[in-house]
């Protein structure tokens, strides 16, 4: 637990919280440590790193632990608690003791790229995980940190006279499943939703003098995200349309063109996928209707009723108040 906020405080209380330094000296708790992009970290905020140090400097202070979500290459769908903390991917500030969850300040430091998957809008690239209620949890996203939802796939074009299929839904960036978390996005840091895929185009038909011509619709474009949405397949079996193009991290893919049967029957084009500021388009309609565009994920999601404090000096693109985390 955090140390008391007033009255007499003993050296043994300080040692119980922060661990025993080699000299058993108050002065040896003047530490300045860098972890990832976090530099000059004191033992806890307000404890001196040099100069005079006194017992009252430790009032209300607690052990600080940085969870490592900054080392290595890109990752997908990771929980700070389950995947990192539980596997000891962390740094205890000061280095005087082993990790301790109860009452500690847990700093989840993100300074690389994380992506989500495409299976559910609630799925997040990074989750805080659930912690002891006495712990203080903050997420610090450094200048190279990116937390990105996945883009939805484009819908398939209508087959012959069939309707186009809807585009896939984008998924989400940061998931908060601990109450009272503070999120700090530093300059250059990014949290971004994944965006929906475009709908597939509808099939077309033309009849005259015993002729019955049909044409399939084009596939929808993929939504922006990481991973990005794939372009939708065209309808087939009649005059085939074209596939939609895939998106990338920031830009949506285009819908594919509809099929052309003898310049008489025309399938409709697929819709463009979604990107920040532009919702995914539905597929065009011919004799059959186009599929709807997929919805967007959220930049930040939280469990219902949870409070989150957001300090943003970087970039957050997408809804910050969506509920439901998985």
Give each language-model segment a name.
Residues 2-326:
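Glycine-centric low-complexity repeats
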